[in-house]
């Protein structure tokens, strides 16, 4: 079971989602579903409006419908708390597709982290999308130069039900900051951005694709956005205690950067229910995911590559449809 500290950190919504997941784990829920369980009416879980998942989910929903010939196919992008919520709702049949961080998906299938004691057995990997960097966002006028400077500050750490929340706590902990050392705002960057602008938040820790349009919007409004680096022994601690990889945000990512910013990253990936999405439809979804990526309007489309489609799969089973597509592409042994 989750510790009381973890439960408080997750909030009621995420805890309720995990309780529902527990009901979906165990014998009979893994593997593929029967034909009567498959559907072409798909709900795609995304994230908050301030991140990349939401617009990407909207655009992919349109691409799926426009490029896949399947009777009755309808795909609707749904705003959610992101990774944890998306995987939990796939487990209980409320979503059929979802975008999530690869490290959160590993936890889901292994019953670890946010999913302690609640293994998800009906989620299949459709493929890696793009890297997501941890971005510790503040304003130049804040005087914040290091994560350690966030002691006593008001920090947005992401909404309950998202992988950002757990990542933010890991980052803060590596710098010696635990619950009570800062005031936590449980919201996504869409809301946190406004609070940074009006002075009701000192910083926001986000896991976002680079470049993040919402961060560029904040710079356009304030003219003083600053990214706080993760480096030194603290960076080593974060990497050693998580599935994050060292990453460097290039200086040309944002106009306000003068030099690269060291940080960590995970991978955003698309997942599908193995109970409700058939092999045939899963194949078409995976094919569209990569062969229509150039049709996206988001900058992250440049990072979506079929050659790297299986990166970050880890312990998550391939969806049968994705396996078929990847075999055709020569990606599997």
Give the role of each language-model region.
Residues 102-104, 111-114, 142, 179-271:
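Pocket-lining segment of extracytoplasmic ligand-binding domains
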Residues 131-144, 242, 266-280:
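A bilobed periplasmic-binding-protein/Venus flytrap-type ligand-binding module shared by bacterial periplasmic
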Residues 20-23:
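C-terminal motif of bacterial Sec signal peptides marking the signal peptidase cleavage site
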Residues 41-67, 131-198, 308, 312, ...:
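Bilobed "Venus flytrap"/periplasmic-binding protein-like clamshell domains
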Residues 62-63, 76-117, 136, 190-197, ...:
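Pocket-flanking alpha-helical
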Residues 25-28:
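Bacterial signal peptide processing site
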Residues 1-13:
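Bacterial N-terminal signal peptides that target proteins for export
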Residues 187, 191, 208-229, 234-240, ...:
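An extracytoplasmic/periplasmic, membrane-proximal ligand-sensing/linker region
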